[in-house]
Amino acid sequence: RVIGVDVVPPRGDIGDVSFVRADIRSPVIAKVIAREQVDTVVHMSVIATPGKSGGRNAMKELNVIGTMQLLAACQKVDTVKHLVVKSTTTVYGASSRDPAMFTEDMGPKSVPRSGYAQDAYEIEGYVRGFARRRPDVRVTMLRCANVMGPHVASPMTSYFRMPIVPTVLGYDPRVQFLHEDDL
């Protein structure tokens, strides 16, 4: 059985998925996890742009505080055996001194100091703490790159949809993208 939780109802048919309308920061989440004896929690509600959440403070509250509330709910319920958390490759940073490829053992050259990258870095720290406190729960962290596709609206997709894409002559940055169908 699959239960979807969000503040926004689904746009279309979601088949056999049960839907609960709730904010990630609400105690309702803990009640749903306990009542339904949830064994796997998939946390995908990390917001990357402040405009979608009502500004930077609201974004941080949803991302970091919301994740902390979810982890606290998972900690209390012994039926939870697997936690999947969506993160981002931005936690690695974008230094010109960075290697072309990162491994899971590598960290950023410097800690992100603002925005989405900082939120993701903090969230990953809280998730690692949860994993130490609940070694019986298998934790999976998905570090996704920028999502692109015909149905994605973001500053990056707007940039690439321009009739002429401005670039800096002689600058060829490394970029990674994830197609929306792969997320």
Please provide the spans of the model-predicted regions:
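Conserved glycine-rich Rossmann-like NAD(P)H-binding loop of the short-chain dehydrogenase/reductase
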Residues: 2-11
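Cofactor-binding loops of NAD(P)H-dependent oxidoreductases
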Residues: 5, 20-22
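NAD(P)H-binding glycine-rich loop region in Rossmannoid oxidoreductase-like domains
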Residues: 11, 24-65, 73-76, 94
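Active-site Tyr-X1-5-Lys
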Residues: 111-140
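Conserved Rossmann-fold NAD(P)-dependent oxidoreductase catalytic core, especially the SDR/UDP-sugar
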Residues: 68-116
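Conserved cofactor-binding/catalytic machinery of classical short-chain dehydrogenase/reductase
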Residues: 40, 65-69, 108, 122-123, ...
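NAD(P)-dependent short-chain dehydrogenase/reductase
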Residues: 130-182
